[in-house]
Amino acid sequence: MKITWHGHAFIEIQVAGKQILIDPFITGNPFTKTKPEDLNPDYILLTHSHRDHVGDTEELAKKSGATIVTEMDMVNDYAQKGFKVEGPNYGGTVHFDWGDVKIIPAWHTTANVPLGMATGLALTIEGKLIYIAGDTGLFSDMKLVGRKQQIDLAFLPIGDYYTMGPDDAAYAASLIEAKKVIPDHFNTFPPIKQDVNDFWKDVPENMKFTAEIDKPFEL
Protein backbone atom coordinates (compact mmCIF):
# COMPACT_ATOMS: atom_id res chain seq x y z
CA MET A 1 0.00 0.00 0.00
CA LYS A 2 0.98 3.63 -0.48
CA ILE A 3 0.42 6.20 2.25
CA THR A 4 0.61 9.97 1.87
CA TRP A 5 0.55 12.49 4.70
CA HIS A 6 -0.87 15.75 3.39
CA GLY A 7 -0.13 17.79 6.50
CA HIS A 8 -2.13 18.37 9.70
CA ALA A 9 -4.21 15.17 10.12
CA PHE A 10 -5.04 14.51 6.46
CA ILE A 11 -3.85 11.06 5.34
CA GLU A 12 -4.36 9.25 2.04
CA ILE A 13 -4.04 5.49 1.56
CA GLN A 14 -3.92 3.80 -1.84
CA VAL A 15 -4.50 0.05 -1.72
CA ALA A 16 -6.10 -2.59 -3.94
CA GLY A 17 -7.20 0.04 -6.44
CA LYS A 18 -9.00 2.03 -3.74
CA GLN A 19 -8.36 5.56 -2.51
CA ILE A 20 -9.04 6.02 1.21
CA LEU A 21 -8.90 9.48 2.75
CA ILE A 22 -8.67 10.15 6.48
CA ASP A 23 -9.72 13.53 7.90
CA PRO A 24 -9.53 15.31 4.51
CA PHE A 25 -8.86 18.88 5.64
CA ILE A 26 -7.82 20.32 2.27
CA THR A 27 -9.35 23.78 1.87
CA GLY A 28 -7.55 25.91 4.44
CA ASN A 29 -4.76 23.38 4.97
CA PRO A 30 -1.58 25.49 4.64
CA PHE A 31 0.69 22.52 3.93
CA THR A 32 -0.79 20.48 1.10
CA LYS A 33 -0.75 21.37 -2.57
CA THR A 34 -3.45 18.76 -3.17
CA LYS A 35 -6.84 20.14 -4.23
CA PRO A 36 -10.26 18.50 -3.82
CA GLU A 37 -10.53 18.13 -7.59
CA ASP A 38 -7.34 16.03 -7.58
CA LEU A 39 -9.02 13.32 -5.52
CA ASN A 40 -11.64 10.67 -6.22
CA PRO A 41 -12.02 8.76 -2.95
CA ASP A 42 -13.77 5.45 -2.51
CA TYR A 43 -13.88 5.82 1.29
CA ILE A 44 -13.54 8.75 3.69
CA LEU A 45 -12.71 7.96 7.32
CA LEU A 46 -13.31 10.62 9.97
CA THR A 47 -12.02 10.70 13.54
CA HIS A 48 -14.37 13.45 14.74
CA SER A 49 -16.44 16.45 13.74
CA HIS A 50 -14.10 19.44 14.15
CA ARG A 51 -13.78 21.41 10.92
CA ASP A 52 -10.03 20.79 10.58
CA HIS A 53 -10.80 17.06 10.31
CA VAL A 54 -14.14 16.92 8.49
CA GLY A 55 -12.71 19.42 6.01
CA ASP A 56 -13.90 18.79 2.45
CA THR A 57 -15.70 15.52 3.19
CA GLU A 58 -19.11 16.42 1.79
CA GLU A 59 -17.79 17.95 -1.42
CA LEU A 60 -15.60 14.92 -2.05
CA ALA A 61 -18.30 12.36 -1.23
CA LYS A 62 -20.85 14.11 -3.46
CA LYS A 63 -18.40 14.03 -6.36
CA SER A 64 -17.14 10.47 -6.00
CA GLY A 65 -19.91 8.62 -4.18
CA ALA A 66 -17.47 7.70 -1.42
CA THR A 67 -18.64 5.83 1.67
CA ILE A 68 -18.14 7.91 4.83
CA VAL A 69 -16.94 5.86 7.79
CA THR A 70 -17.07 7.34 11.26
CA GLU A 71 -18.51 6.85 14.74
CA MET A 72 -22.15 5.73 14.96
CA ASP A 73 -23.79 8.95 16.17
CA MET A 74 -21.83 11.26 13.91
CA VAL A 75 -22.50 9.15 10.84
CA ASN A 76 -26.28 9.61 11.20
CA ASP A 77 -25.96 13.23 10.10
CA TYR A 78 -24.36 12.12 6.85
CA ALA A 79 -26.91 9.35 6.33
CA GLN A 80 -29.73 11.87 6.62
CA LYS A 81 -28.08 13.93 3.88
CA GLY A 82 -28.09 10.92 1.57
CA PHE A 83 -24.45 9.86 1.77
CA LYS A 84 -23.37 6.23 1.85
CA VAL A 85 -22.16 5.50 5.36
CA GLU A 86 -20.77 2.93 7.77
CA GLY A 87 -20.96 3.78 11.47
CA PRO A 88 -19.62 1.31 14.02
CA ASN A 89 -19.47 2.41 17.64
CA TYR A 90 -16.48 2.35 20.02
CA GLY A 91 -14.82 -1.06 19.79
CA GLY A 92 -16.68 -2.01 16.64
CA THR A 93 -15.10 -2.98 13.34
CA VAL A 94 -16.35 -2.65 9.78
CA HIS A 95 -14.85 -5.00 7.19
CA PHE A 96 -14.10 -4.03 3.60
CA ASP A 97 -12.46 -5.93 0.76
CA TRP A 98 -9.34 -3.76 1.20
CA GLY A 99 -9.11 -3.98 5.02
CA ASP A 100 -10.75 -3.45 8.40
CA VAL A 101 -11.57 -0.21 10.23
CA LYS A 102 -11.97 -0.36 14.01
CA ILE A 103 -13.33 2.64 15.93
CA ILE A 104 -11.38 3.18 19.14
CA PRO A 105 -11.36 5.82 21.89
CA ALA A 106 -9.64 9.19 21.87
CA TRP A 107 -9.74 11.80 24.63
CA HIS A 108 -11.06 14.92 22.94
CA THR A 109 -14.20 16.99 22.40
CA THR A 110 -16.34 17.28 19.28
CA ALA A 111 -18.30 20.00 17.51
CA ASN A 112 -21.99 20.45 18.32
CA VAL A 113 -23.07 19.49 14.80
CA PRO A 114 -22.77 16.78 13.67
CA LEU A 115 -22.96 15.03 17.00
CA GLY A 116 -20.77 12.12 17.99
CA MET A 117 -17.66 11.23 19.94
CA ALA A 118 -14.03 11.82 19.12
CA THR A 119 -12.31 8.62 18.07
CA GLY A 120 -9.09 7.04 16.98
CA LEU A 121 -8.86 4.48 14.20
CA ALA A 122 -7.13 1.10 14.07
CA LEU A 123 -6.77 0.01 10.46
CA THR A 124 -5.75 -3.50 9.44
CA ILE A 125 -4.68 -3.46 5.80
CA GLU A 126 -2.66 -6.13 4.01
CA GLY A 127 -1.91 -7.68 7.38
CA LYS A 128 -0.45 -4.46 8.78
CA LEU A 129 -1.81 -2.43 11.70
CA ILE A 130 -2.02 1.35 11.42
CA TYR A 131 -3.00 3.44 14.45
CA ILE A 132 -4.52 6.86 13.77
CA ALA A 133 -4.71 8.45 17.22
CA GLY A 134 -6.84 11.37 16.03
CA ASP A 135 -7.01 14.41 18.26
CA THR A 136 -6.33 13.18 21.77
CA GLY A 137 -4.60 13.66 25.05
CA LEU A 138 -2.36 10.98 26.49
CA PHE A 139 -4.19 8.05 28.08
CA SER A 140 -2.94 4.68 29.26
CA ASP A 141 -5.30 2.53 27.17
CA MET A 142 -3.37 3.52 24.05
CA LYS A 143 -1.12 0.58 24.86
CA LEU A 144 -4.03 -1.80 24.18
CA VAL A 145 -4.17 -0.92 20.48
CA GLY A 146 -1.22 -3.18 19.71
CA ARG A 147 -1.89 -5.86 22.30
CA LYS A 148 -2.52 -8.63 19.73
CA GLN A 149 -0.31 -7.36 16.93
CA GLN A 150 2.51 -4.85 16.92
CA ILE A 151 1.51 -1.54 15.37
CA ASP A 152 3.33 -1.07 12.08
CA LEU A 153 2.70 2.67 11.81
CA ALA A 154 1.20 5.25 14.17
CA PHE A 155 0.17 8.86 13.61
CA LEU A 156 0.31 10.84 16.87
CA PRO A 157 -0.69 14.51 17.39
CA ILE A 158 2.00 16.68 18.97
CA GLY A 159 0.59 20.21 18.71
CA ASP A 160 -0.38 20.70 22.36
CA TYR A 161 -3.19 23.12 23.36
CA TYR A 162 -5.93 21.09 21.61
CA THR A 163 -4.18 17.71 21.94
CA MET A 164 -1.19 16.21 23.70
CA GLY A 165 2.08 18.03 23.18
CA PRO A 166 5.54 16.72 22.26
CA ASP A 167 6.38 15.32 25.71
CA ASP A 168 3.13 13.40 26.13
CA ALA A 169 3.19 12.27 22.50
CA ALA A 170 6.70 10.87 22.96
CA TYR A 171 5.49 9.00 26.04
CA ALA A 172 2.55 7.72 23.98
CA ALA A 173 5.05 6.40 21.44
CA SER A 174 6.76 4.45 24.22
CA LEU A 175 3.40 3.06 25.36
CA ILE A 176 2.25 1.81 21.98
CA GLU A 177 5.66 0.47 20.86
CA ALA A 178 4.90 0.97 17.17
CA LYS A 179 7.48 0.05 14.56
CA LYS A 180 7.23 3.54 13.06
CA VAL A 181 5.72 6.80 14.34
CA ILE A 182 4.77 9.96 12.43
CA PRO A 183 3.91 13.18 14.32
CA ASP A 184 0.95 15.19 13.03
CA HIS A 185 -1.47 17.98 13.97
CA PHE A 186 1.13 20.70 14.57
CA ASN A 187 2.19 24.08 13.11
CA THR A 188 -1.14 24.51 11.31
CA PHE A 189 -2.41 27.30 13.58
CA PRO A 190 -0.56 29.56 16.06
CA PRO A 191 -1.75 27.69 19.20
CA ILE A 192 -0.22 24.43 17.94
CA LYS A 193 3.14 25.76 16.77
CA GLN A 194 5.83 23.26 17.75
CA ASP A 195 9.43 22.34 17.07
CA VAL A 196 9.13 18.73 15.95
CA ASN A 197 12.55 18.02 17.45
CA ASP A 198 11.01 18.43 20.91
CA PHE A 199 9.09 15.27 20.05
CA TRP A 200 11.84 13.38 18.23
CA LYS A 201 14.40 13.82 21.01
CA ASP A 202 12.42 11.49 23.29
CA VAL A 203 11.43 8.91 20.67
CA PRO A 204 13.63 5.82 20.13
CA GLU A 205 15.62 6.01 16.90
CA ASN A 206 14.10 2.84 15.49
CA MET A 207 10.59 4.33 15.70
CA LYS A 208 11.31 7.60 13.92
CA PHE A 209 9.80 8.04 10.47
CA THR A 210 9.81 11.38 8.69
CA ALA A 211 6.99 11.67 6.16
CA GLU A 212 7.35 14.37 3.52
CA ILE A 213 4.12 16.25 2.93
CA ASP A 214 2.33 15.13 -0.26
CA LYS A 215 5.00 12.47 -0.93
CA PRO A 216 3.69 8.87 -0.92
CA PHE A 217 5.62 6.09 0.78
CA GLU A 218 5.23 2.32 0.85
CA LEU A 219 4.22 0.38 3.94
Curated annotation (Swiss-Prot):
Gene3D superfamilies linked to this entry: Ribonuclease Z/Hydroxyacylglutathione hydrolase-like
What UniProt keywords apply to this chain's record, in alphabetical order? Hydrolase
Hydrolase as a keyword of this entry, yes or no, is yes
Q: Pfam families in the record, alphabetically?
A: Lactamase_B_2
Claim: Hydrolase is one of the keywords in the record: yes
Xref: SMART domains? Lactamase_B
- GO molecular function per UniProt: hydrolase activity
Family designation? Belongs to the UPF0173 family.
Task: Report what the protein is called.
Answer: UPF0173 metal-dependent hydrolase LSL_0324
Species this protein is from: Ligilactobacillus salivarius (strain UCC118)
